[in-house]
Each structure stands twice: as C-alpha cells, then as structure tokens.
C-alpha cells in the first residue's frame, strides 16, 4: 500500500480521536480530576506505554546535537500544548474548542514562512485573516456562562494558544521524525513532558480519589491516555515521516464536524448562530491557506498521466 496514503490515513485517525476527545475529556473535568491533573495523567500514562513497547524495538542512539530540538518539541507538544488545551476545554465548550483548533494549519503556515522562508500569497494572507476573525468571534461573542463552561472567552483564548503550540510542535518535530524511529522519539519526549508538567500538575493529580472513581470517569480517563495521547501522537508522528506539517494540519478540518456530531448526540453542546458564523470564517480561512495553486495542481495532474 502507498506510504503517503497510509500517512494520510494515520493523520485522519489522529484527528478523529481528537474530535471525539473534545467531549469525552470535557465530562470528567473538574468533577473527577482537574485540568492540570489530567495533563499529568496523560504524559505519565503515555510514558509507561511507550517505554513498554520500546522493548520490542531496536535501541537507537540520539545525537547530542538533536537534544535541544527534542527538548523544545517536548515543551510545546507535551507541556504547553496539553496544558492550554485541557485548561481551555475545561473553561469552554466542546464545539468552541474544536472550531478554534482548526487554526493550526494557518499557524503552521506562518511558522513555515518564518523558519523555512516560504513565500506567502495574497490569498493566503486573506485566509489567515479570516481564520483569526473566526477565532476572535468565538472568543469575544461566545456566551459568558454555560453548564460546565465557567469562562468561555478565557477558555477560547487558551485554545488559540493551544493551536499555536501544536503548530510549533509539528514544525519542530518534522526533521526529527525523518531521522529517528517514532518510538525512540516518543520514549524520550514524554518523560521530558512528565518533568515539565510535574510542578504544575502534581497538586491536582494527588487530590484525585483514584479508588472511588466510577466507571464513567475511568473509561474516559483511559480513552484520554490510550487514544488521545498514545495513539494520536503515534499516528501523527508516523504521518510526519511521509507528509509535511501543513498537510497534517489540514486534517483539523474534521475535528469540528466530529466534535459537533458527538457533542450534539450526547447533549454536551449545541450549535448556534455565532458558532456557525465562526466555523464558516475559520473553515474559509483554512481552505484558502491550504489550497494548492492551480499551476501546482495542473503540474501534478500532468505528471500522473506521463
């Protein structure tokens, strides 16, 4: 099977997990575990899982020159990104958060322009403006209070920060993904994430009544650790070996659709006019940013028939 197709399938799988996670993780906060405590649970669980399966893979030495990039990638991907996402989700709603994270491909493009010196077209500038307009609409005009969403504007703002950090993570980790085995990277990045999150999260983590948790909380925590953290990061890293960060970012299109369907079915959120407008602005912006120029598309088609 074509490696690129498998990479796109992996990116789709990771995005589908993230889409479900907006509602699944939302339900357990703060009733069973605080936002910071959940982050520590994620990185601890993923560390154990990656080191566990690491025994079945050949050991790989990491070059000393790459540790700086690994540290930065871990900081943005396993600490800042997770803290902002979980805290933002605890304050906002599943649909709001899923719409805002679709800014990721726009942010990845901006970072690519800065670090890779890529050219940016007027169409992409318009797309960036539309995307941020959608995010600002949610931040400024979202309802000020909803059940289990005590501070929606602040939560939405934190989700924008999350999208930025995840974009930085994708750009920073791409060269590493091409050089090292996926398990090798995850084995070292998640323990770094544990050390970074420990001072912030240990208090809430220790307050959890682990023996008294109902099944409703246990399976949701298990989903967040096993699927949202272990499998999602594994799938994204696999995809990065074959496709650029901007391509993976495009798959965040699907997160709002998946989140809206699941949240509506479970009664955890509902769509309204403001959210619809914001979604249209964000989708329109991301589409303009990520759409290939006609010249490139025509060249690709011509190459297919040669």
What are these regions (language model features)?
Residues 1-41, 148-175, 195, 199, ...:
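Glycine-/small-residue-enriched transmembrane alpha-helix faces in small-molecule transporters
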Residues 49, 53-59, 104-129, 133, ...:
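C-terminal transmembrane-helix exit sites in multi-pass transporters
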Residues 28, 38, 42, 88, ...:
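Hydrophobic/aromatic residues within transmembrane alpha-helices
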Residues 50, 71, 123-142, 197, ...:
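Hydrophobic transmembrane alpha-helices of multi-pass small-molecule transport proteins
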Residues 11, 38-41, 78, 82, ...:
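Helix-helix packing/entry segments at the starts of transmembrane helices
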Residues 3-8, 32-36, 40, 62-68, ...:
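Juxtamembrane helix-entry segments on the extracytoplasmic side of multipass membrane proteins
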Residues 30-80, 107, 165-172, 186-205, ...:
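Transmembrane alpha-helices of multi-pass small-molecule transport proteins
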